[in-house]
Amino acid sequence: MSTSGATSALARSGENGAAGPSGSGREPSTGTAPSDIAGPARRRTGQSRRRRGSLSADLIVTESLRLLDAGGLAGFSLPKLGRALGADPTAVYRHFASKDDLTLAIADRLIEEAMTGLEPGPCWQETLEQLIRRIRLTYRRHPAAASLASYRTTQGPAEMRAVNVLIGAVLQAGYQGAEAARVYRALGDFSLSWAGGEAHLLALEPELQQADRSAWRGAYLSADRATYPNIWQVRDDLPDVTEDAIFETILSVVIEGVVRQAPRPCTCPRHARKDG
């Protein structure tokens, strides 16, 4: 789980004198998150200058996520974060060694939100599906933050818990050793890559999102039959394909692949009846 350029917004955040170290045309989903997933970042009231030592790493991450939700990547910088916290921007470095450390903490907060309320059950297929869906919904709820840090390996407590749950489901399926590690990495990378890709699209300015969405009713809808015969056959259906439908289709393909190769089929009542 790695990426390059994920900290570009923070790399520019030393502007204004702050000190310290340095898509595919799809419409936003109408799906809603499970009720047991934590909602948006908590808001802090009062912007007066804070007393030295009154800041905490948790508060800094919460306020960072609020700023990213409200103003996107363009609305997030260390000077703005300092003003929102009522503190000097350099105070951040008493809690985070670098901007990248803050980025990783934000990424771990997103995973924490996705994991809230998730309790693995006897059905390993459902555990895999729920975790992957939760990551996607959380990233869609916080697209700017997700696009900043979606592919990072945080090594934080939330990520460690998510990895433990995911590997546990893979072990339940009968995979062992190197094969279990490979299947886990494939599922984890699929989840973060897909959710991160959607987040990058949703983090764009609304007019750019609209320009991408309109392509399916523009160039593709009017594709020349002789030049693009395959596009022409499905041109009327392409604009109606939703984000949710695309995701659920690829998720089912991925999970079915894991099921087909699993040494130990799921024995929960739902899948036992289906397999029988």
Model-derived regions, located:
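Basic, helix-initiating cap at the start of DNA-binding domains
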Residues: 1-80, 84, 97-104
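C-terminal peripheral helix-coil segments that are non-catalytic and often amphipathic
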Residues: 1-44, 200-276
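Short amphipathic alpha-helical interface segments enriched in basic and hydrophobic/aromatic residues
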Residues: 69, 111, 115, 136-140, ...
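Short hydrophobic/aromatic patch on the recognition helix
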Residues: 86-96
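Hydrophobic alpha-helical bundle segments that form small-molecule/ligand-binding pockets
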Residues: 162-190, 194-217, 239, 258-262
